[in-house]
C-alpha cells in the first residue's frame, strides 16, 4: 500500500492525462487496480493536504496507462478486471467488457419480477463474462439459472466470476450455440435473456480501435446475419 499526499497525486495525475486519454478512462484505471473509487477522487478537493492510499505504485499505474495510450488496448483488459453494478469481474479479450447500458437488462427483469424471493428458472444466451446471469442469481437467491456461451474460454471466465462473486450454487454454465444446450430445459423456463451480437459488418469496420482490435469479434458482429435472416423471411 502506497501512501501519497493529495497534492502530489494530483500533480502526477495531471502529468499522465497530458500524455493523452480521458478522465473517465483514467478513473477506471485508478478504480480497477489503484484502489481509488470515484468517491475517493471527488473527496480529494476537500483536503489537499490529506493523504491517499494506493494499492499499486505510481510507476506501475503509469506503465499501464502508457500501454493503453500506445496500443489502444482497453484499460479493463490491461488490468484484468472491471467493475459492473456491484460486481468485480475478471475480463480478458475472450469476453466483451460489460457496458453500463447492459445494466438495463437486469433492471428490466427487476421491474417485472419484483419479489426477490421468487423461485425463477432463467436462462441467458451468450453470457460472456457472466455479468447478467451472476447479477440475477445474486438478486434472486431462490432461483435457478443456466448461462450458455459458444466459447469455452468465455465460460471459464464466467464460472470464475460466479465463484468469486457468490457462495451460492444456483447458477450453472453450459457450452453450446444459443438454444442448443437448453433442450432439456424446454417448457421449464420463466425467463430467457440475451445481449446478442448486433453490430452490422459495415459498422464493425468503423468501430474504435480499442473495440475492434481487442474485444472478441464473435461477441460483436451479428447485425448482418440478422438482416439476412429478416430479408429471407420477406
Predicted regions located by residue number:
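Conserved SAM-binding strand-loop segment of SAM-dependent methyltransferases
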Residues: 167-178
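Short conserved loop adjoining the S-adenosyl-L-methionine
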Residues: 178-186
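Conserved small/polar residues in nucleotide/adenosyl-binding loops
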Residues: 227-234
